[in-house]
């Protein structure tokens, strides 16, 4: 699963708010809701967040293995 927890920490360190994302990066309120809910967003959005916050992808997202998810068959 993808976590956006690093995004919120990066925003706090940079003194950015969701309003900053909307104004500086033209990130829509619906996209911000998706981020808060942990839903998927486009790579264009991830790129815009990196640009706005002057950071890398690792500062925005983290991959968390889903231990409860069954392994996919090899075919």
What are these regions, as identified by a protein language model?
Residues 1-20:
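A short, Lys/Arg-rich alpha-helix, primarily the initiator
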Residues 38-51:
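Short, basic-rich loop-to-helix N-cap that marks the start of a DNA-contacting helix
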Residues 15-33:
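Short alpha-helical DNA-recognition segment
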Residues 10, 61-75:
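Short, charged recognition helix plus adjacent turn
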Residues 28, 39, 64-67:
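The DNA-recognition helices of helix-turn-helix-type DNA-binding domains
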Residues 12, 23, 51:
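Alpha-helical residues within the helix-turn-helix
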């Amino acid at each position: 699963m993808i976590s956006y927890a690093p995004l919120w920490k990066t925003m706090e360190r940079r003194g950015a708010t969701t309003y900053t994302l909307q104004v500086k990066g033209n990130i829509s309120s619906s996209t911000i809701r998706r981020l808060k809910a942990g839903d998927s967003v486009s790579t264009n959005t991830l790129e815009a967040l990196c640009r706005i916050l002057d950071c890398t992808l690792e500062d925005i997202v983290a991959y968390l293995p889903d231990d409860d998810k069954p392994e996919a068959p090899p075919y």
